[in-house]
Regions:
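N-terminal leader/targeting pre-sequences
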Residues: 4, 9, 18-121
Length: 121
């Protein structure tokens, strides 16, 4: 999976009980802070769980990690003595404290979502 130092997309879901859907703005982030908007992700409650519908622009073609993080901040924070992009978002959402990070294809914690694939067009 390709990694992008200048563009890390993180997602935090804070949906109210009465809300059937929520639209969340997505921004590019760097170790200096939150940057330009690149679109939205619409999150809808369905009978099978949450559905994530990204409407994003300006991402390079290829695979991108797609995650739900534990905290509602995409600000930089210190990691190993250096500013790190979106570190304030915390780890991936793991409300059951499974401690399992098995990636998008595994049966890990709830914060791991399928890989987001961006086509050339």
């Amino acid at each position: 999976m390709k990694r992008f130092a200048l563009a890390v997309v993180t997602l935090v879901v804070c949906a109210g009980a009465q809300a059937a859907s929520e639209e969340v703005e997505m921004n590019l982030v760097t170790s200096q802070g939150v940057g330009q908007s690149i679109g939205t992700v619409k999150i809808t409650e369905t009978d099978k769980g949450l559905e994530f519908a990204p409407d994003l622009k300006a991402l390079p073609p290829g695979e991108h990690g797609f995650h739900v993080h534990a905290k509602g901040s995409c600000q930089p924070a210190m990691k190993e003595g250096k500013p790190s992009a979106a570190e304030a978002a915390g780890g991936h959402l793991d409300p059951h404290n499974s401690g399992k990070h098995e990636g998008p294809e595994g049966m890990g914690h709830l914060g791991d979502l399928p890989v987001l694939v961006v086509n050339n067009d």
